């Protein structure tokens, strides 16, 4: 369990990606809202596939969780996000689902004044999870992992289609693109 870095932002040409609290919502990771930075990142603070990211400051965002389902090279989190990494002997798919299931409980664990709530690493570390036998965890992973990949692929396709729509629609509306000679799409 580790907190992120204090980044030195350089959104123009930063060599690494920094995930912030805005990126974590509805159990999804939106890298469109991430920023770039130049500072060296210790290996412990590099995000890995299977990590669970937990928003750790502020009322309204504290306790939101998501799991990383793909390799994200040169990616870290800022100090407002905690990385919870499953032990080697725990299935990452099961770990992510278990943490996600108790998100509303995690939201209640913040300490401090209303606008200064903080979720400490030690508090996250004291959360007890009931662990099924490893063969059950592995069966769970075998079933769930392809679904997680499909969700990730569909989210990427949706993002691509939205960008395509935003590019094409103004050109279609202005008449810059003429589709009258195209055969109908059925």
Pin down the residues of each PLM region.
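Short, contiguous acidic/charged loop-to-helix segments that flank catalytic cores in large enzymes
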Residues: 37-40, 71, 86, 131, ...
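Short acidic (Asp/Glu) and glycine-rich catalytic loops that position anionic groups and cofactors
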Residues: 28-29, 74-78, 142
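A short beta-sheet element
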Residues: 20, 42-104, 110-112, 120
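Sequence-specific dsDNA recognition surfaces
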Residues: 1-9, 17, 21-52, 67
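Amphipathic alpha-helical coiled-coil/heptad-repeat segments
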Residues: 89-90, 97-108, 112-113, 122-186
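Short clusters of hydrophobic/aromatic residues that line enzyme substrate/ligand-binding pockets
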Residues: 29, 37, 65-68, 106, ...
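Short secondary-structure boundary/capping segments
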Residues: 9-10, 73-74, 116
């Amino acid at each position: 369990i580790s907190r992120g870095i204090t980044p030195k932002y350089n959104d123009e040409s930063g060599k690494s990606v920094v995930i912030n609290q805005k990126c974590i919502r509805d159990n999804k990771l939106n890298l469109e809202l991430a920023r770039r930075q130049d500072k060296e990142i210790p290996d412990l603070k590099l995000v890995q596939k299977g990590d669970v990211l937990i928003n750790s400051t502020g009322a309204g965002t504290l306790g939101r969780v998501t799991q990383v389902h793909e390799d994200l090279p040169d990616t870290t989190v800022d100090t407002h996000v905690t990385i919870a990494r499953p032990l080697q002997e725990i299935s990452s798919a099961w770990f992510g689902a278990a943490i996600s299931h108790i998100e509303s409980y995690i939201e209640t664990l913040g300490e401090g004044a209303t606008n200064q709530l903080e979720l400490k690493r030690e508090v996250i570390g004291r959360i007890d999870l009931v662990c099924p036998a490893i063969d059950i965890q592995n069966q769970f992973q075998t079933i769930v992992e392809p679904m997680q990949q499909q969700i990730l692929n569909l989210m990427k396709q949706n993002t691509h289609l939205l960008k395509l729509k935003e590019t094409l629609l103004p050109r279609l509306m202005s008449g810059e693109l003429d589709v009258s000679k195209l055969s109908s799409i059925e």
